[in-house]
């Protein structure tokens, strides 16, 4: 029997969320990516919360509070280390961390982000066009040069996102969000889940997935569900 390295515990986490309302997983994650960059890892540990009856706004609120809590704890409990890094590695580190903790994250739709990029005079290596994923240079431009603080981009085109993400009424976007930090880029990705059984099956078929292979997941929607 074939076995695979896990990329996420999310789908399984949804099972427990149906019973316990608020749960999280913390475990190893493997990605078939080139890890010879400052932004990619082939293996890392990831926290994945799953909450029943959370909409996209609730997800964005949780993501913002989570990042701010973690950064504040690092600044409080690892002050000497942060001071060392600020002195020897990046003299703007402490300023960047305070900016994360002290400011409300900017929120804008994917469409608004595309408009911001298209009206910019900056020349990007990758073209800016609605329907394509934002590249690292786009994300950093928005967080570092336009807003100069953490941002949350939401309502992405459905064709570039996963089948389980809640489809908006327009039918063109899904209730997904990414948290982008200055000097780093994307640090959190999340979404409101699609709770409609028929819509979920169609989304699977549109992405050429076999619903029978996800029968256990579809049962969560067939016999009562929550977003």
Where are these regions (language model features)?
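Residue-level recognition of alpha-helix termini/interfacial anchor residues
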Residues: 77-81
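Metal-dependent enolase-superfamily TIM-barrel catalytic cores that perform enediolate-based chemistry
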Residues: 71-75
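A translation/RNA-centric and nucleic-acid-associated enzymatic feature enriched
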Residues: 2-69, 83-227
